[in-house]
């Protein structure tokens, strides 16, 4: 029978734990696969973008006997398109354009006896934004823009046992840098941007080896760009809302 510490460990790392004996003596390895619905909006000086898409989520976690953990996560869109925030017909006759995105996250952390966890990590998000034909047929322009955002984050969370499962709440602060390759192939680098991430998840055991995890996350980051006096791009604001579900297997 799982004890209180084991359930908190499961929720804190967003995966289900098996017996506390494994957690305390041998360590644990888990793999996960899932899907998430993502709502992403970015606003910058000179334009905006909005996309709603599904992504495939893959990940693996190793938990040491002393409740330190290392997590590797990867997300990739399954099919995505973008338009302006207001969806006006003035842009591309109201038609959507292709959008691709992948996110890589590495996290290390420690789960304490009271269900509190401290964690830190690195995230890299890369996106390709297809441009309307009317914009790239002009001389010197390209068919797509590229956006890369990467940086480090620190966070804290707390897990609570609820029936047969556990709820986890977490908050993180990130320092991120953005790089944009624009419609004429110029690369713009931001100065340090920052922002926050708020998350909540519910984890429930199905068997000794399988569990289900449901999660929701809100992220918001802002950037300033040093464009050497150019007025086309000076700042940017990104906002992401994610709702997902994962199936987790413990080896």
Language model segments and positions:
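Residues on the lipid-exposed face of transmembrane beta-strands in outer-membrane beta-barrel proteins
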Residues: 35, 58-62, 106-110, 120-122, ...
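Repeated loop/turn-to-beta-strand initiation elements of outer-membrane beta-barrel proteins
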Residues: 31, 66-72, 114-118, 164-169, ...
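Predominantly the C-terminal beta-signal and adjacent terminal strand-loop region
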Residues: 192-251
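Transmembrane beta-strands of outer-membrane beta-barrel pores
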Residues: 35-41, 74-80, 122-128, 150, ...
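Outer-membrane beta-barrel strand-turn architecture
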Residues: 17, 62-66, 110-114, 160-164, ...
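Flexible, solvent-exposed loop segments that connect beta-strands
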Residues: 41-49, 78-99, 126-148, 178-192, ...
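Short glycine/proline- and aromatic-enriched beta-strand/turn motifs that initiate or cap beta-hairpins
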Residues: 22-89
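Residues that define the transmembrane beta-barrel architecture of outer-membrane proteins
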Residues: 27-29, 50-56, 98-104, 124, ...
